[in-house]
Structures are given as C-alpha cells and as structure tokens.
Amino acid sequence: MKVFSHQDEVEFISDDSRECTPKSAFLLTQSSRVYEAAAREKGCKLFLEPKDLHRFLKTDIPLIGVTGTNGKTTTSAAIYSILLDLGYKVALLGTRGFFMNDELIEPKGLTTPPLLELYERIDRAKRAGCDFFVMEVSSHAIDQKRIEGLNFALKILTNITSDHLDYHKSLEHYIQTKNSFFDDSTPKLINKDESKAKFNLQNALSYGIEHPSSYHVKAYSLHGGIEARIAFLEKEASLSSSLFGKHNLYNLLAAVSAVHRLIGGELQEICDMAERFGGVEGRMERVSEEPLVVVDFAHTEDGMRQIFESFPHQEIVVLFGAGGDRDRSKRPKMGAVADRYAKRIYLTSDNPRSEDPLLIIEEIEKGIHHCQKCVKEPDRVQAIRRAVKELEAQEVLLILGKGDEAEQIIGSQKIPMKDRETVLSALGEIRGVR
C-alpha cells in the first residue's frame, strides 16, 4: 500500500517493496521486514518502524480500541453512535467498514486492516476534523502487531470465549493474545464478569452485571427490550433500549461506560443517547415480526448461546453452518448448544470455502444427540426458504453465522447472497401464494 506523506523529505510511505523509489520510505512491519533488501534495490534509503509514522502522518486523535470474542461490532457502533448524537465528529473502523460522521467511506474488509492502511485511516479522520476514532481490534491484529505504535485513549474488553483456534492453535494462546492488549498502563475498561480477563490494574475501570464493578447494573429487565438502572460511584441513570438480550445489555453498558470515561458529563445524558442506537445490521436483526425471523452473526458456541437465551419464552428454530478452512473444534460444540436450546435445527453451509459442505455438517452433527430435530440442506438459500416455509406462529427462526455478509464463499467463488434478502424473498412468495 502507498500512503502519501505530509513531510517534504518523503513523497510516500509503502509496505510493498515493489512500489519503492528513491523518494519513498519503506515501512518495516512483522510481515514486510523480509523485503527490506528488495526495497533497497529499488533505491529506497529511508526505512521506518511503526513508531516513526507519527512524524509523517497525523495520528494525534483519541483512539478507542474494542476487543473481545463477541460484541466488538455492536459495542464499537454504539460508542460511535452515542458520540455522534452528543455532537462530536467521529470515525469508526471495523468489520462493517470505515465510517466518518455517519457516512460510509470504505466498504467492509478485515476487522482490523494492515498497519499502514490503519494509520492512513486515522490520518484521514484527523484531517477531516474527527474528535474520536473508534475501532475494533481483532486477535489476529494483536498477534500480528497491526496496531503497533498506536497510542490508545481507551481500550475495552467485551468478553473472551473460544474462537479462531485454526489460527491460535490453542485456547490458551488465544486468551493470552486478547489479554496482552491490556498489559500496559493505557486507560482501560474491562468486563468484570469475564473470568478469563487478565490486565494491568493501572488506569483500569470495570463494568458488569453479576459482579461489583466501577459501572454496574443495579437492576434490569429484558422483557420486550432492555430496561436497566446503571450506577457509577454515587451517580445513577436509567437506560432503555429496543435491543434484545443480555449480551446487548453488556454491549450498551460497555458503550455508555466508555463514553462517560472519555468525556465525563452526565451519565443520564449518555444513556439517553444510547437509547437512540438502533443496533447493527445483521446483529440480532429482526427481519420479520410475524413470523418472527432474526438474523445474527453469531458463529461460536458462546455467541449462539447468548442469542438463544434472548428468547426464553419462545420455541426456537435455528439455521446455521460453520465456516470452512476455519477452527474445526468448535463445530460439534455449536451443534451441542443448538441441540440444548432449539426445537428444530437446519444445518447448512456458511462459507464452506475449500471444504465439502456435507462433511462440515457431519462434524456439527456430532454434537447433536437428538438428530431427529435436524434438517440437513447444504444449499443455504434453499435451507432458509424451507425454514421460513415450515415456521409456525409460536416459533422464532434464528438464522446465524453470516449476519450482514453479502456473499457466500464456495470454493474460490464468491456468490452473492444475503440472509436478510433471502428471508424477505421467501416470505414474499409465501404471502403471494396465500
């Protein structure tokens, strides 16, 4: 990637040796360092470490980094929304793309982009006059040092459960990677109910529901949305939201706590702004009310459990698969949690990539003891159509795994499809017949 510099001594900075010239600087990252000699052959004379980028790009903007297995996207989006509604100029970078001041600037890509691209986004936000830069921080980015050299104003932990073991190889390494983000003295906000959290106590505040914490929920109701009473020291505030589920109470609590820690002010005013946040597309998105159909990105055992527990008074029907060429150990666990909560299970594809979709389904099925519940249909579109058609009035259909993704990866092909649109099409056909 090529990023133009604000200093006359360098025309541009690149992490690709093939782009280098005598007037460029080459960024030495964990992945690009092996190409240093190739950059020299191109005539490049200036070599930069990530900490040097502050000399050439504008990065002096408060950075808020959110990490965790689940909840990063919703928590980040809620912080972004609250700050915007309070009148600040804000940038947001994450799974859904790069946003500035309620405008989509770049479409979705990696949760946390490569280091030079990330610095370029921060530089662009600073030049646009943004007061804050909110970003999701993935475990891959922490491990690959894609956030090296950045000075965060606040770091936030949502939770830690099992994920990405295809990359990290063990749960222990995954947990260590997440926790390493909180090793320094940077101001931090930690989920006190997360038993796996390990962090530097300096400048640490916490939030929680079950355990005493800096920001804590004194009482709450999850019937028909969220109603909660939040306390911080001697201050109390009421929080209302149309979002569903205890996991979203955690997400909103983290967001409210983060904004209060960043700007101070009245806790109640921040809660009032949080009430305006309508959620994120593909995250507990109610595509239809009658029948009730919900689309969500949940793709881990814990993420699925949180969704299931958000519907304690309804009969649950679930449709999901598991990503190919990814952590295989979680597949039977996903099957087991579905077996525990769901009345009927539709097993299908979720980006099978190079794997055989039927073999992935078989691995999920190993965790399901009541196999009579299962319907196996590897074609995700057909599975959704069938699930919608067979849905009964007292049931809720939860379509999990892909959220707002707009394509299905099969082999090397990316085939356009979106769960939400497939549901609406199926409902349209049913209503047309009736």
From Swiss-Prot:
Coiled-coil ranges (or none): none
Binding site for ATP: G68, T69, N70, G71, K72, T73, T74
Description of post-translational modifications: Carboxylation is probably crucial for Mg(2+) binding and, consequently, for the gamma-phosphate positioning of ATP.
Alphabetized CDD domains for the sequence: SIMIBI (cd01983)
SUPFAM superfamilies with a match to the protein in the record: MurD-like peptide ligases, catalytic domain (SSF53623), MurD-like peptide ligases, peptide-binding domain (SSF53244)
Reaction catalysed by this enzyme: UDP-N-acetyl-alpha-D-muramoyl-L-alanyl-D-glutamate + meso-2,6-diaminopimelate + ATP = UDP-N-acetyl-alpha-D-muramoyl-L-alanyl-gamma-D-glutamyl-meso-2,6-diaminopimelate + ADP + phosphate + H(+)
UniProt binding sites for UDP-N-acetyl-alpha-D-muramoyl-L-alanyl-D-glutamate: S17, T111, T112, S138, Q144, R146
Cofactor(s) the record lists: Mg(2+)
Motif Meso-diaminopimelate recognition motif in this chain: 350-353
Keywords: ATP-binding, Cell cycle, Cell division, Cell shape, Cell wall biogenesis/degradation, Cytoplasm, Ligase, Magnesium, Nucleotide-binding, Peptidoglycan synthesis
Pathway recorded for this protein: Cell wall biogenesis; peptidoglycan biosynthesis
The protein's Enzyme Commission number: 6.3.2.13
Residue numbers carrying N6-carboxylysine: K178
UniProt keyword Mitochondrion, yes or no: no
NCBIfam families listed in its UniProt record: murE (TIGR01085), PRK00139.1-4 (NF001126)
PANTHER family, sorted: MUR LIGASE FAMILY MEMBER, UDP-N-ACETYLMURAMOYL-L-ALANYL-D-GLUTAMATE--2,6-DIAMINOPIMELATE LIGASE MURE HOMOLOG, CHLOROPLASTIC
Function: Catalyzes the addition of meso-diaminopimelic acid to the nucleotide precursor UDP-N-acetylmuramoyl-L-alanyl-D-glutamate (UMAG) in the biosynthesis of bacterial cell-wall peptidoglycan.
HAMAP family: MurE
Record's protein name: UDP-N-acetylmuramoyl-L-alanyl-D-glutamate--2,6-diaminopimelate ligase
Organism from which the protein derives: Wolinella succinogenes (strain ATCC 29543 / DSM 1740 / CCUG 13145 / JCM 31913 / LMG 7466 / NCTC 11488 / FDC 602W) (Vibrio succinogenes)
